[in-house]
Amino acid sequence: DFIRTTEERHKRVVTRVLQDIYDKGEIYYSEYEGLYCVGCERFYQERELVDGLCPDHKKEPKRIKESNYFFRMSAYQNWLIDHINQNPDFIRPKQYRNEVLSFLKEPLEDLCISRPKSRLTWGITLPFDENYVTYVWFDALLNYVSALGYPEGETYQTFWPSVQHIIAKDILKTHA
């Protein structure tokens, strides 16, 4: 099944997942100051830049300060490392498993999952704050389960527990 992230069934899944995560206390509101690439719609750390430029657009990111919502990804760092080490076939081939483990040795930062509507007008509105939309890379990753009818769909129940993904190496870090 092919799905677009603009479809209502996808929006319903994203809204549900966001609300579930928010209700569990895994999403918080905070101010962020950092380097922002307009072309990527993404914040970068200094260490991710190439000669001070966005690695994709080769342009200097803008330093901005704004309030957004964040997913407590840092809380899952040790669990992820343990899971990958205890399940060697979880990421294959080995070189990419090692790459992900190397990435996870650095402090895992919480993930900014929103953009203010005042700056970005398109996107799925956060169910707990109508002034914000979901960051595209957070909602796009959920299309794997929304296409399968998450959470009750028969296709989801059949395929997701044993799913295997083939991920291009240039988006490995985003998926990891």
Regions found by a protein language model. Name each.
Residues D1-P93:
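N-terminal, positively charged nucleic-acid-binding surface of large information/translation enzymes
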